[in-house]
């Protein structure tokens, strides 16, 4: 009997259709380009740098974060189930002369073949796009080496996040295409921490990611009402 993959075909198709524009700084993925320096710095600071470390980026898409980590001297593997985003990621890496590897696989499949392999695992803006986020979290815990770091980012589920991420970002400001997110799939920090309790991962810190529409800029802070990042270690 074939094991059912932890993917949502509609989610895969959504990002496949936009894949060619992944590296367009003014396109649908502009917010990802804007927040990437913040995400990268958060990982660098909390993982004590990435140079020479083996890093896995789960749900890498077109490779924005994965490529930036490779440029820090990390040995990076980008993991995604979308064929087109991975094609775009590989082409962009060739164009920029960035050395890293991209693999089409689920986190669960990769974990079976690569237990305790990575010094750092990142899973950014991905948990809210899969049917079973706990399964992904367990896989990340399985793939990181003892003493290693795992980073998760997702969106909180409340009225404010609905107004900011759905009404504001998708409908009014059109920062991302309509239908990019499903508010019902957003994950409260308390829910994410309960999932972590079902693994050996220990939460080390949580920070919010804030958008200022007046300046069109992002920053990190204590408020986790909308976007947030969690740092864990094994």
Swiss-Prot record:
It is an enzyme of class 2 (transferase). It holds the Pfam family Methyltransf_23. S-adenosyl-L-methionine binds at residues 39, 59, 80, 124. GO terms for molecular function: 2-polyprenyl-6-hydroxyphenol methylase activity; 3-demethylubiquinol 3-O-methyltransferase activity; polyprenyldihydroxybenzoate methyltransferase activity. Pathway: Cofactor biosynthesis; ubiquinone biosynthesis. It comes from the Bacteria. Its EC number is 2.1.1.222, 2.1.1.64. The keyword Transferase applies. It catalyses: a 3-demethylubiquinol + S-adenosyl-L-methionine = a ubiquinol + S-adenosyl-L-homocysteine + H(+); a 3-(all-trans-polyprenyl)benzene-1,2-diol + S-adenosyl-L-methionine = a 2-methoxy-6-(all-trans-polyprenyl)phenol + S-adenosyl-L-homocysteine + H(+). One of its GO terms (biological process) is methylation. InterPro entries: SAM-dependent_MTases_sf, UbiG_MeTrfase. Keywords: Methyltransferase, S-adenosyl-L-methionine, Transferase, Ubiquinone biosynthesis. PANTHER family: METHYLTRANSFERASE, UBIQUINONE BIOSYNTHESIS O-METHYLTRANSFERASE, MITOCHONDRIAL. O-methyltransferase that catalyzes the 2 O-methylation steps in the ubiquinone biosynthetic pathway. Belongs to the methyltransferase superfamily. UbiG/COQ3 family. This is Ubiquinone biosynthesis O-methyltransferase. The lineage of its organism: Bacteria, Pseudomonadati, Pseudomonadota, Gammaproteobacteria, Vibrionales. The gene is ubiG.
